[in-house]
């Protein structure tokens, strides 16, 4: 009981980013579970996804929807709560927050307000895909999602065609075929490609 009280006290005024499972809910660390149980509130992309984690590990907490559609409206109120001393955890639907999601903007704003953030490491889809690909992994480039605007997309694809290092790209399933055709067009047919999903 004393150990639990000390853990709870550690969370009273802290800000966390917490890595969540990218496919298997059992991949959540003990430390991550403890933080998510004890912070005042959790900001998450989709409350339904985070609710699955809480159900799996039998705890409840106050969830705040924080995603690309509402992040700029939510950031000021979240920073206000943090300045008032409330503890807070930021999670994404899967993997580490701030990689291709609006968590990046929240963390930047927190730090500019003198509110350092503690990272609770967890699974990362990009690194998991890289290390299981069989492609060179000592040096790599993370590209994330490519721009949708045609001119910007062409510019990035041309840059990728010149990269010598392994390049990691995110893409949604329904746009994957188009991306593969584009990569063949810009990079040629002799470039090795690995497709990873359900990591």
Description of each model-found segment:
Residues 1-12:
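Single conserved hydrophobic/aromatic residue that forms the stacking wall/gate
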Residues 141-162:
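A short, charged helix-loop
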Residues 165-166, 170-199:
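A contiguous loop/helix-start segment that scaffolds small-molecule binding in enzyme catalytic cores
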Residues 40-46:
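A short beta-strand/loop micro-motif in the catalytic core of glycosyltransferases
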Residues 15, 85-89, 165-166:
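Loop/turn-to-beta-strand initiation segments
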Residues 66-72, 146-149:
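Conserved helicase motor
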Residues 22-23, 93-97, 173-175:
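Short glycine-rich anion-binding loops that position phosphate/pyrophosphate groups of nucleotides
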Residues 83-143:
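Short glycine-cluster motifs
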């Amino acid at each position: 009981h004393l150990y639990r009280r000390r853990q709870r006290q550690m969370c009273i005024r802290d800000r966390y980013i917490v890595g969540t499972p990218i496919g298997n809910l059992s991949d959540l660390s003990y430390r991550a579970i403890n933080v998510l149980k004890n912070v005042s509130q959790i900001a998450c992309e989709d409350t339904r996804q985070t609710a699955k984690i809480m159900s799996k590990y039998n705890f409840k907490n106050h969830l705040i929807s924080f995603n690309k559609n509402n992040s700029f409206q939510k950031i000021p109120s979240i920073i206000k709560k943090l300045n008032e001393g409330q503890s807070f955890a930021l999670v994404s639907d899967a993997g580490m927050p701030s990689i291709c999601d609006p968590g990046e903007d929240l963390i930047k704003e927190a730090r500019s307000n003198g509110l350092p953030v503690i990272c609770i490491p967890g699974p990362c889809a990009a690194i998991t895909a890289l290390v299981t690909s069989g492609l060179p992994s000592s040096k790599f480039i993370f590209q994330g999602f490519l721009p949708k605007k045609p001119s910007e997309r062409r510019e990035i694809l041309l840059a990728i065609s010149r990269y010598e290092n392994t390049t990691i790209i995110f893409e949604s399933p329904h746009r994957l075929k188009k991306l593969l055709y584009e990569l063949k067009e810009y990079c040629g047919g002799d470039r090795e490609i690995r497709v990873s999903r359900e990591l």
